[in-house]
Amino acid sequence: MKYDYSSIDYFTSSRNRITLRNMYSLGYNVQRETALWITSDSGDWFNYSLAGVKYIITRKNLDNDNKIYSYEYKGKYGEFNIYETQNTLPYAYIVNSNQQPEEIDDPFYEQTKNPFEMQNNILKSIQNSDEDYIENIKNEQSKIIKSEKNIVKTDKEYEITYNVEALQNISISLFSDNNLELYKNIFKDYSNIWERETGIRQIVNLEKGQKYTFKITQKIEKYDLNNDNIKIYVLNNHKIEKAIEHAKQVQTQKVTLGKDTVKINIRSDNEAYLTFQIPFDSGWRATINGQKTEIVKMNGAFLGIKLQKGNNEIKLTYIPRYFKISALLSLISIMVLLIIICLEKRKSNII
């Protein structure tokens, strides 16, 4: 679920700062100074699919320039609009590789891993494919977009204008750590995207044949310092949709959710990873076919298991961190209390 103003609620259970910063590396718009939530406009539509965001509840109208691919209007609840999609990855899906971001314990570090490339590699690992699902807008050989770029330097800033034409159904998205402003068809969309609260932002979703113009402005000193950090990429919507459908077909068994357990029976033709739409937490324990196995941090943020070739009967059990220590301390406290009570009784009897 994604609100207009304050987060993807699903991930508020994840308080691990490293995990949240890793989610930033995947393109999620994380408030990195406090690292407690994921803000709205939090990535491209594949980000939402990774997190299992089936519904968006917002005051905005997600149409025209604001349309998010595959999210369809379902009605209103009070002042809120409700949108639904069928294009979320299953709760557990198989990939053949694990993409790991930098794990740096600093909320202000400069991102060097490209989140679009990480997403592209995840999609490749879902279908075991070498083809690209997300590509740089600079790709002159692109079969999904035509683009023309013009740069004008004024007294205070650079103006970078893109005129594009969609050759297929596409979504165009932006990532940058540096302050900038975005204009969609002349109109300003937002300003001052800054390093403590940033991530992938969708520019526009286009159908085949549509033309569009957008402009980015950035102060001269910022642009001259690191203009390569403005990343604009194009999502091949239908191709990504097919990868998601492939993941659903592979997971033929439903996931069974208990109070503190997750169970699934899944077959794998090769050694691979099973990724769950659960934030990684060291409190999880796992077994495969009754034998203990290690949990894996998938793509820096999600819970995963390394599968064996053949049938895998998986059970996940959650034990809160420090639960054993707390239980031990409670037991010791009870024992000490009982000893004190016994000593007090003995004193009373002696008197």
Segments the model singles out, each with a brief description of its role:
Residues 7, 67-105, 310:
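C-terminal, active-site-flanking charged/polar segments
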Residues 126-351:
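Active-site-proximal, structured, solvent-exposed surfaces of multi-pass membrane proteins
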Residues 62-63, 88-90, 281, 321:
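Short, solvent-exposed loop/turn segments at secondary-structure junctions
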Residues 1, 68, 93-96, 276-277, ...:
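Short conserved micro-motifs at the rims of enzyme active sites and ligand-binding pockets
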Residues 52, 79, 282:
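Residues that flank catalytic or metal-binding motifs in active/ligand-binding sites
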Residues 1-49, 89, 94-127, 190-194, ...:
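Extracytoplasmic/lumenal acceptor-recognition loop(s) of multi-pass membrane glycoenzymes
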Residues 28-76:
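Periplasmic/luminal catalytic loop of GT-C fold multi-pass membrane glycosyltransferases
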